[in-house]
Structure formats: C-alpha cells, structure tokens
Amino acid sequence: MSDQKFISIRGAREHNLKNVDLDLPRDKLIVMTGLSGSGKSSLAFDTIYAEGQRRYVESLSAYARQFLEMMQKPDVDQIDGLSPAISIEQKTTSRNPRSTVGTVTEIYDYMRLLFARVGIPYSPATGLPIESQTVSQMVDRVIALEEGTRLYILAPIVRGRKGEYRKELAELQKKGFQRVKVDGTFYEIADVPPLDKKYKHDIDVVVDRVVVRPDLSTRLADSLETCLKLADGLAIAEFADKPLPVGETAEGGSANKSANETHERILFSEKFACPVSGFTIPEIEPRLFSFNNPFGACPTCDGLGTQQAIDPNLIIPDESAALKDGAVAPWARSSSPYYNQTLEALGKAYGFKVSARWSELSEEARQAILYGTKGREITFHYDDGLRSYQTTKPFEGVIPNLERRWKETDSAWSREEIERFMASTPCPACNGYRLKPEALSVKIGKKHIGEITEMSIRKADAWFRDIDGSFNEKQREIAARILKAIRERLQFLNNVGLDYLTLARNSGTLSGGESQRIRLASQIGSGLTGVLYVLDEPSIGLHQRDNARLLDTLRHLRDLGNTVIVVEHDEDAILTADYVVDIGPAAGVHGGKVIAQGSPQDIMANTNSLTGKYLSGAMEVAVPAERRKISKTKRLRVVGARGNNLKNVSADIPLGTFTAVTGVSGGGKSTFLIETLFKAASRRIMGSREHPAEHDRIEGLEFLDKVIDIDQSPIGRTPRSNPATYTGAFTPIRDWFAGLPEAKARGYQPGRFSFNVKGGRCEACQGDGVIKIEMHFLPDVYVTCDVCHGKRYNRETLDVLFKGKSIADVLDMTVEEGAEFFSAVPAVRDKLETLVKVGLGYIKVGQQATTLSGGEAQRVKLAKELSRRATGRTLYILDEPTTGLHFHDVAKLLEVLHELVEQGNTVVVIEHNLEVIKTADWVIDLGPEGGDGGGEIVAVGRPEDIVQEKRSYTGQFLKELLERRPKRSSQAAE
C-alpha cells in the first residue's frame, strides 16, 4: 500500500497491544471502538498521536524543543504516512480562574480588537460620548486650582512597557530636558539608574514646574502643547506638595492610573475626556479590555470578577437553631462563656434572649449581631470563672470581626478557619465584569464588552450578525475582517451543541465533553489541513439531539483534508464513520488485538466483534421485564429550585429506585441534581459546608442517612495513590504479608510492606520504582530504579513470598488475577471482586491513580461503595457514569447500579445514554432547550410516560429505541 493513502502501523506493542499491524486510510473519519481497557487509547493516543507529535517536535531546533513537551517514543516497529498530530483529549481543561470560554476560543481576543478599533467611549457621569479635550480646556482646568498650588507639568512618554530606554533618555537630554520621573521617582536624566529590560517601566518627562497664578495661561499652554507632542496626546499636572516624601514611589503615581484625578495628579488627554466629570481614558487599545493585564483589569478583584467575602448564610447555617445552641457558626465550637455573655449583653440592648431561635430575632437584632452596633455603645459583663469585669463599647459584629482577623492574621490555620465561612461573590467594583470602569465605558451598539460576554453563544451569534448595521462606512471597513473571525467561531460553537454557554463562563466549570468540543471548535476555526486529529469521546455530555451536529463538525474537519481518528462508543458515531477499528476481544491483558476493521457494515457482519453484535441487535442492553413500584410516601421532593437557569422547578425523586435525570446539554440537569439536591442534602445530612444553589426547601431527607456524589475527579493526585489503596484492599494485603511465617520470623510489621514510609521501601527511589531525570529540551526521562529494578521495595521485603509472589508482584497483577490469587483471603478478595464487578478487572492492583481515566476513577469509587456494608438509606448521585464505556460495559455497570438499588438505596444519574435511560424506574427530563431556553421540567415519570411527551427530545429518541428493541428479563444478553 502506498504511504500517501494510508497510515501504516507495524508491530505496535504499547501497554497491552499485542504486536498490532494496521493500515488506516488517510483523510477519512476513523472510529476506534472496543471494551474499556481493550487498548483503543493505547493505539490512538499513546502510539499514533505520540509518534506524530514526537516526529514533528523532533524536526524543530533544540532551542525550540526545550519549550515543548516531548513525547516518549512509543513501543512500535514502524509507522509510515503520519502527519503532524493534534490531540483533543478530555483531561486538559484549564482550572485557571482567568481562563474563560471566550479566551480559550480566542473570540475574546477578537472582541478586544473590535472594541479598541470601533468602540465609542461614553462618560459614566453624563452618559454622553466622550470628546477630546482642547489645550484651552486643559489650561482652564489648571487655572481653576487654588492659587499658589505648585505643579509639575509632565509628559508620560513610557507607560507600562518593558525596555532599557537608554536611547530615548539620551534623545530627551539632547532636546534640552533635564529631569524625568522613572517608576515614581524623580531623577536628573544623567543620573537615571540602568533599567531592567525584563520589567515594565513608567517614564514621565518634566516639561515645566509652575505655581498656579491668573497670568500663567500662555506659559501653561506652551508647556501642555509640548507634553501633548511628546506623549502622543497626553499630559499630566502633578501636585508638587504631595504628602509622600520625594524619592518614594507614589501610590497611583503611574500615568495609567484609572481615575483621571487623584490627590497627586490630573491626567489630560486631547483624545478622550468627559468635560463635565473630567473622566479621562488614557488610550483605547486592545489591552484596555484584557482582564489579564493591569491596564484593563479591575483593580479591586485583579480581573477575577469575584471576591472572597464572609457569607452570612455560612455564619448562620440553620435559622431554626437557638443562639445558645450554636446558631452563630463561628462561635459554636468554643467552650468559652465569652460568646454567650456577649450575646446576653446584646440581648438586653435589643430585646431578645439567648434561648431564642435566630428566625425569631428582629431584623435590627440580626444586623447588630452580624454587622455590629454601628457606634451604639453596649455594656458587656464577662465572667470566665477566674475574674469578672465589665466594659462599655460598640460591638464590632461577627462579620467585620472575621474580615479584620482574616486580613491581619499571619497564621495559615486561622485564615483557613475563617475561609470556611467565606464564599465567592461578584466583585462590587466591576459587578463581576472583571474590567476597569474605563473599559466598561466603551460601547458598541449600547453594550459594553462585559455585557456581550454574559450573553449565551446563541444570542451573541445573533448580535454579531446584526451589529454592523449600526456602523458608519469607515467603521464597517475596519470591523469587517474582525467580525468574520468572530462569527465563524461562534457558528462552530453553535454547531457542536454549545449554544447555551456564555463567553464569560469559567473554563474550570466545564465538563470534559464541553471543554473538548470547545477545543474542537477552535481547531476548525484555525482551518488547518493535512493534520492528524485524535479525539477522545467528543460525544460525552451531548444529548442525542446534538449528536448529528457534532458528527457534521467531525466530517467538516475531515473534508478540510485532515485525518480524524476518534475513540468513541456512540452508536451514531460508529455508523457514520468511514472506517471502524474494533479492538478487543476483552479488556487489559485479554485485549490489545484488532478484532475487526472496515466499514460499519463489515463490523456488523463480523461474528467475532462484540461491537458488531450490539450494532446489529444480536446483543443488547435489555429493558427490565418490569420496573420497580414507585412509593407514594417515601420520596425526596426538591421545591422551588432557582439556581443558574432553573425556573422555580419542583420535582419528586422516588426513594429506593433508579432515577435518570435527562435533557439537552445546558438544560439544568447538573444545577438541579448536583448544585441543589446534592449540596443541600450533604449539608443537612453530612454536615458539609457546600453552599447549595437557590431553592425553597427539600423534603424527605429524614429517610436518608448518607448522600454520596460519585464523580469523575481523580482518586488521587500522586502516583502513590492506586486502586488498592483507595478501595482499602492494600491494608489487608499488607496485614496478610506481615502475618506470613517468614515476616513474623523477621519481626516485620504491616508498615514494612508500605512504599510510602521508610523501612520496607527502596530508599534509592523512595518507593516510586522510577527516578526522574530532567533533560530540558528532551522529554524528562523516568529511568527504572537500578537498585530495586522498579519493584519499589528493598530486597529484604521482597524476600517475603506468598504462593511464590512478593508484595511487588501482587501490585503488578491485574485486579482479576489478584482476586483469584487471594481467593482464600476474603478481606482482599471481596474488595477486588467489586472492582471486577464494575468492569475494572483489567487494571493493575497497584496502577498509579494518575493514569486512570475519569470514567475509570468513577468506577473505582463505585466499587468502594459496593464493598461497604449496605445501610439501604443512601442516596448515590452519579454524573454520566457511562463515560468511556462500551455497550457491553454499560450492561455490566447497570447490573451494579441496580444491585445498589436492590439493597434499598436510591441511585440518581445524570445521563444522555439511552441504553441507561430505558432501564430507569423514573425519569426527570429537563429542558426543553439549553441555557435560557431550558430550566423547566419537560416530562417526568416512567420511560414509557416520557415517550408520550411531544416537547421532550429525550422522549423522541427513546421512543425509537423502545420500539426497536424487545423487553427481556435479563440485564444483558451474553
């Protein structure tokens, strides 16, 4: 086969791949599928992408390579026909609070450019467009100052820019200027110290020194004109008699200060200034609209848009509690009589008793306790058993007291304690828009840049399509190319089903599927051709309705002339592909082979392919023969949920059932289930400090004694954490080894078999098994420790054997092998068998937690819950548990979830996978659309009821599935 038409892989052995030979057609949409852990990602990411990326990076200079992450060479004999590779995974969502949907997609960068070039500044005082100031207006403003005021007339020639500026200073000296102000300090030009070119500097030239007198006008006008020429339309009148000593950097002494007038200076601009309030904008450049740049960022919140502030709801978590019983949470833990005596004194002044509930206090009394007596003096009597005293003073208030202590304390422990009562609130200075007043005063079509980022992508798309109608000819010409780039990117975001997000949405709050689709939209926006794209389950978190749009996007990427490889389990994606590779036959050591390849029809015709059997209907996830009975009395009821886009929603969740919360992306599922129900329930039942979304109340929590959110966050952030340590299987394994005759004879305790503490571990690598060597412009090399040869333990520890295996050998077994190996040790076997039950028999007992995918981490947590003794009163909440699961794995997972329900527990899942929804006892469908068009309950009831609701998109797709597939009593066809 010619290299041009195929990517030819020979002898791929990465991870569990069994010497795979494969030819993939170029410029096609290729789907790789197979059971979880069968080797799809090993082939797509760790072999094909890694080699494509490595070869591209290797072609760069050694200097450039040190800035790029270099991939390890995969274990493969040969790959031909590769292009430079780009991977779009789910793991790389930025948690940086400064990263937003707008910045990630680069739409915000184009918006900054648009506002800088065609935006019109308006005065906050008058609401009128800001005009430029004339020299006469500037002179009048200075003459209006108090007579005798001494001023420097300065020209701000450098503002916040890096450089040494030796040449510029020499030029100024030649022109006859003698003094400059550099970074807040005055110097003779000859005496200016060398400036560090790596740092930003401010340089003002002293053009004149004047004393305000009525006859100053002519001289002042000349000086100001000189300034305006030197500093590109800017001039500063700085008060010489300022309170700070000369030689110190003045607070706000730089020309870029946001207010045009301070106690030190007046900033004039012949470009933009409000004649009424004097509000001046130094410049309108793209950086003015950047919240990551000091020129544009709101100085109060540093461009984050939020501030940590004491939250009154966390101070008084339960309004029905009595004051003496700890209604004021920060005081509740203290055993000192001081706080109760403080409340008694306040009670005498405001007419309440300490036995009163918080809800019974007057508004005046509540305000006094929380915010202080505002100068009103209170007489306090204190008696701590050792001494008694009386004092009369105003009461500071719980919240001001905590705020003061938080600012003043040097103790990390004290800060942490106080932070438990703090919540993130929108910044009061910028209202959460992140920018300075100057940036927000610039508008296009009566909207500032912050208001546009708050729109949903759907609305922003419509706004940008219509806005050039309000431009004049010149503005239209300037904006044409910028608008084209913005509209294209918004259109792509719409196409991948993200029309409900806002551009201001923080990247850290996006789900894996959302962030992946955002990066997908950015890639299409870049318009590259001849590239190899490797994607990891882009359909995660996407409703069936939006699936077609996503697949159109992938086909568009292919049609640009790229090869698109997608690791995917979605039926529609597999059937749409040009070429399908099915890897199996099972997971882990039992996988790693290509079972079937070719068109979707070829896969269905292949009798060895498990995927083919599910696609053709020969096997299926079956609908239960009968659904559980719904209790009319035992149910949870969420009343009046109003968080995010929820529109005062109330819904019942029957206890002891399997409930699915469904709906299109952005319909309000996570807000309803995680932000409202889970956070409120865990606060009431588990005593957590999570702050739930706005709602009236939740009824029925008395039927529960535990609430658990089994999410996809990592089970540990270090390589030392693994499935055995997380599920608790490692403790009985260590105990077992410590109980062996050889260990007893040597006096070894269980700690001897831990790789985290000194004693039994190899000290050369400190129990890691590998040693990291930094290589700068080559990838960091992890070399196997030459003392323990990667075993993590020292020789003496490894001498203790059970059935001929050391503790290191046990950690290297798959979970399946481990369960068999410890079949006679129930404490270990039972925990490992639960991992097998959730479909994780293929992972290693000691596999590093950092190498587990989100779906795998979630199933490890599920296994841990399964191994606990059932109380039958637990509420389990899972967000998309089928992430990364093949049809066959979904069937297994459903068995596990239904088993939890059979024990009397309640399981609620957020899910788009119709195979899961059809087996649910109860469905709550939210929508009908995403974002503003969602937040309502569209349908509720059994799956058969949802199908009847015309407005429900879920119902429409579910109807096809229920009609297509018969009912069976078994959970999965074997």
UniProtKB/Swiss-Prot annotation:
GO terms for cellular component: cytoplasm; excinuclease repair complex. One of its GO terms (biological process) is nucleotide-excision repair. A zinc finger (C4-type) spans 762-788. Keywords: ATP-binding, Cytoplasm, DNA damage, DNA excision, DNA repair, DNA-binding, Excision nuclease, Metal-binding, Nucleotide-binding, Repeat, SOS response, Zinc, Zinc-finger. ATP binds at residues 34-41, 663-670. It is found in: Cytoplasm. Residues 331-610, 630-959 form the ABC transporter domain. GO terms for molecular function: ATP binding; ATP hydrolysis activity; DNA binding; excinuclease ABC activity; zinc ion binding. PROSITE patterns: ABC_TRANSPORTER_1, ABC_TRANSPORTER_2. PANTHER family: UVRABC SYSTEM PROTEIN A (PTHR43152:SF3). Belongs to the ABC transporter superfamily. UvrA family. This is UvrABC system protein A.
